[in-house]
Amino acid sequence: MVARVWSLMRFLIKGSVAGGAVYLVYDQELLGPSDKSQAALQKAGEVVPPAVYQFSQYVCQQTGLQIPQLPAPPKIYFPVRDSWNAGIMTVMSALSVAPSKAREYSKEGWEYVKARTK
Amino acid sequence: MSESELGRKWDRCLADAVVKIGTGFGLGIVFSLTFFKRRMWPLAFGSGMGLGMAYSNCQHDFQAPYLLHGKYVKEQEQ
């Protein structure tokens, strides 16, 4: 009797945890349209770092530990979009002139071989 | 489509993919721990579902200027 009640309780607890997770996802519209997901990610990016910082400060106050200040990471500016676009344009222009260039080089090569065999 | 609009669409797609894959993974963890005895397949299933949903959203987003959507309009009775 006790074992059955305990297994039922366990099932209810697991069901409520899983149901709560599903409801949270539904309420925050995380699996909905892309603009809602983007807004949720932006909100998380604004909320999480101050929360983590406050928690670390609280832990430091309670335990007396001092977390050392890390130096700021170096800012690297590499315009991926520009270099990617330039790369794509170079590749596409090379592909577009490839047949005519191949014809020209093969013609030159043929002329060269003809001249050598005369 | 202008390049800035294309860039915005790509940003939205990537953010959407991150959120959906993460959500699917998280739900997979919850269900794996609660009902499926810590097996790996709910995690893979959830992540895959999130990836598929993100891909579908991205596809609709990029094809949006070219797709024509019909709408049913109810006749208004006077």
From Swiss-Prot, chain B:
Record field: transmembrane: 17-36
N-acetylserine PTM positions: S2
Name of the molecule in the record: MICOS complex subunit MIC10
InterPro entries: Mic10
Assigned keywords, A-Z: Acetylation, Membrane, Mitochondrion, Mitochondrion inner membrane, Transmembrane, Transmembrane helix
Gene Ontology BP term (one): cristae formation
Protein's gene: MICOS10
Its biological purpose: Component of the MICOS complex, a large protein complex of the mitochondrial inner membrane that plays crucial roles in the maintenance of crista junctions, inner membrane architecture, and formation of contact sites to the outer membrane.
Keyword Transmembrane: yes
Localization annotation: Mitochondrion inner membrane
UniProt similarity note: Belongs to the MICOS complex subunit Mic10 family.
Subunit and partners: Component of the mitochondrial contact site and cristae organizing system (MICOS) complex, composed of at least MICOS10/MIC10, CHCHD3/MIC19, CHCHD6/MIC25, APOOL/MIC27, IMMT/MIC60, APOO/MIC23/MIC26 and MICOS13/MIC13. This complex was also known under the names MINOS or MitOS complex. The MICOS complex associates with mitochondrial outer membrane proteins SAMM50, MTX1 and MTX2 (together described as components of the mitochondrial outer membrane sorting assembly machinery (SAM) complex) and DNAJC11, mitochondrial inner membrane protein TMEM11 and with HSPA9.
Record's bilayer topology term: Single-pass membrane protein
The species this protein was found in: Homo sapiens (Human)
Any Pfam family hit: DUF543
A cellular component term, taken from the record's GO annotations: MICOS complex
Mitochondrial intermembrane compartment spans: 37-78
Main localization, broad class: mitochondrion
Keyword Transmembrane helix: yes
